[in-house]
């Protein structure tokens, strides 16, 4: 077996012995850092560099819940509950905020059509369309847990308030957490 130093080239298949290629033998443009990965980058010496493996990391999780009955007859979105509210300060402006929620909805009239949405400070993230609720009525009282999810890109590193809002489609009474059911609302900051 021949011993080589520097770059090795050949026109046919070359075999490298086991346990020979290590950090010292790689042609990389920078020094390694624990937790970093080796990434191909054209233009760098050797075409490789050590970089933080980004994207998709959960940076923080905040959960809120409420079990007190809250009701409204408003046909415009109003604050559903001061407890179904999350304050979050994104770590980077490129972060996304992903929400999931299980919201206990109740309508006193089967055709009240309660709707819920998420507000970022004063902005309705559904654009007024709502993110969940009763879409059909049967004339009876109804209670249901509505699952909601939404992905937001706030482009901010300042504290942001996200809150559940509710409205009645008909002006009849609608409620959250009727009979002390529990609603939950969770935010995940996802690194870019």
Predicted regions and their residues:
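Extracellular repetitive beta-rich solenoid segments
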Residues: 1-57, 92-93, 192
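Extended, low-complexity regulatory regions
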Residues: 84-86
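N-terminal leader/pro-regions and domain N-caps
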Residues: 53-67
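Terminal beta-strand-rich extracellular "head" domains
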Residues: 64-65, 71-76, 89-96, 100-159, ...
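Short, solvent-exposed loop/turn segments enriched in Ser/Thr/Gly
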Residues: 34, 80-82
């Amino acid at each position: 077996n021949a011993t080589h130093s520097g770059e090795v080239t050949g026109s046919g298949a070359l075999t490298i012995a086991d346990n020979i290629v290590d950090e010292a033998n790689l042609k990389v443009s920078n020094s390694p850092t624990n937790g970093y990965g080796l990434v191909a980058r054209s233009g760098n010496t050797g075409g490789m560099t050590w970089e933080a493996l980004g994207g998709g990391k959960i940076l923080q999780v905040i959960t809120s819940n409420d079990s007190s009955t809250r009701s409204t007859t408003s046909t415009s979105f109003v604050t559903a509950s001061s407890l179904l509210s999350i304050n979050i300060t994104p770590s980077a402006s490129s972060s996304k905020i992903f929400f999931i929620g299980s919201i206990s909805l109740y309508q006193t009239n089967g055709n009240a059509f309660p709707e819920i949405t998420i507000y970022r400070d004063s902005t309705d993230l559904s654009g007024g369309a709502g993110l969940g609720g009763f879409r059909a009525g049967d004339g009876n009282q109804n209670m249901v847990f509505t699952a909601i999810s939404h992905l937001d890109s706030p482009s901010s590193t300042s504290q942001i308030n996200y809150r559940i809002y509710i409205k009645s489609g008909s002006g009849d009474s609608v409620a959250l957490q009727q009979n002390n059911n529990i609603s939950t609302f969770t935010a995940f900051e996802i690194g870019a």
